[in-house]
Regions:
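Extracellular/periplasmic metallocenter environments
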Residues: 122-130, 155
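N-terminal pre-ligand scaffold of iron-sulfur
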Residues: 35-104, 109-113, 143-158
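Short Cys/His-rich "knuckle" micro-motifs
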Residues: 111-114, 129-131
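N-terminal secretory signal peptides and thylakoid transit peptides that target proteins
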Residues: 1-34
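Extracellular secreted precursors and ectodomains with disulfide-bonded cysteine-rich loops/domains
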Residues: 26, 101, 106, 118-120
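Disulfide-bonded cysteine motifs in exported proteins
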Residues: 23, 98, 115-117
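Short cysteine/histidine-rich metal-coordination sites, predominantly Zn2+-binding motifs
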Residues: 117-124, 134-142
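Cys/His-rich metal-chelating microdomains
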Residues: 31, 106-109, 125-126
Length: 158
């Protein structure tokens, strides 16, 4: 059984075609995962716990009991209400910061939190617990929302 021999020219043509095809397919991929929560904080950063909340009349309400990921000062969580996601950090016994969870760099949902810093899994932007950019590539702060905490219920006003 004779196998046809491939010439050097044919081999090079096939190799160049394969590399070109791979490059084209790479360009069709997405840049991160805009506006949908990821499974990790990126770069080994621990993921935020997800807390489900309810939204009505321009307000999001979150129950914060002893079992909540937001029960202790210095904690943070990814709060989801319908199709909206918020980063919430507990900064004091009765004080919280709430901001959009959508990274200002390319629209990925920020899902990581480590050493008091929110981390975007797509390109590594870092934000303080007040939503300010700590480290790029993002250049704009996260949009903040007013909060009120009464009787173990956190209210975020949109």
């Amino acid at each position: 059984m004779d196998t046809p021999k491939t010439s050097r020219r044919e081999f090079c043509a096939h190799a160049i075609s394969a590399v070109t095809l791979a490059s084209l397919l790479e360009g069709c991929g997405s840049k991160g995962n805009p506006a949908s929560p990821g499974t990790g904080g990126g770069g080994g950063t621990p993921s935020l716990s997800i807390v489900n909340a309810t939204a009505a009349s321009g307000r999001v309400t979150v129950n914060v009991d002893a079992a909540s990921p937001l029960a202790s000062v210095g904690s943070a969580a990814l709060v989801q209400a319908g199709n909206q996601s918020f980063l919430v950090a507990r900064t004091g016994q009765d004080t919280f910061n709430a901001m959009t969870a959508v990274c200002t760099h390319e629209g990925c949902v920020v899902t990581g939190f480590s050493s008091g810093t929110f981390v975007c899994p797509c390109h590594g932007s870092q934000y303080t617990t007040s939503g300010q950019v700590q480290n790029g590539p993002a250049t704009r702060a996260l949009q903040r929302f007013n909060t009120q905490f009464t009787n173990n219920v956190l209210t975020i006003t949109l």
